[in-house]
Amino acid sequence: MLFPGCRSRALSSLCFCVLVLACVVACQQEGPGGTSSPSPEPASSSWSLVPGKMKEWMESLVTRTRESWQWFWGPRAFQGFVQTFYDDHLGDLGSHTQAWLHSSKDSLLNKAYDLCPQLLCRDSYWD
């Protein structure tokens, strides 16, 4: 559920979650000896070679990207990123959430008061 007026915060939180998920997947895929692609099997037609070539191309792309971003996967750099992200985007979320809860409570009470007949709901009850 998105809080009114906090869509940019929700989007930044979603991007952060996707980034963390990508980090976890990349760390899990990395084995102790690195990734090695199996040797391609002989194929009967040239079209059957396409999936193998695509897989080989993607594995090399992922490996090169992982190697060039190795500094980012380290715990020190990632911890610094998380701390900066929290300070920039999530640090004052508690005060925003409290303000939203108070405004929602007031709005809900006003709607309930409007629906309540005058004979059942006296002014002294709501004060």
From Swiss-Prot:
Name of the protein this chain belongs to: Apolipoprotein C-IV
Family label: Belongs to the apolipoprotein C4 family.
Coiled-coil residue spans: none
Compartments, record wording: Secreted
Main location: secreted
One Pfam family per UniProt: APOC4
One of the GO biological process terms: lipid transport
Native organism taxonomy: Eukaryota, Metazoa, Chordata, Craniata, Vertebrata
General function of this protein: May participate in lipoprotein metabolism.
Keywords assigned: Lipid transport, Secreted, Signal, Transport
Cellular component, GO, one term: high-density lipoprotein particle
Signal peptide span: 1-27
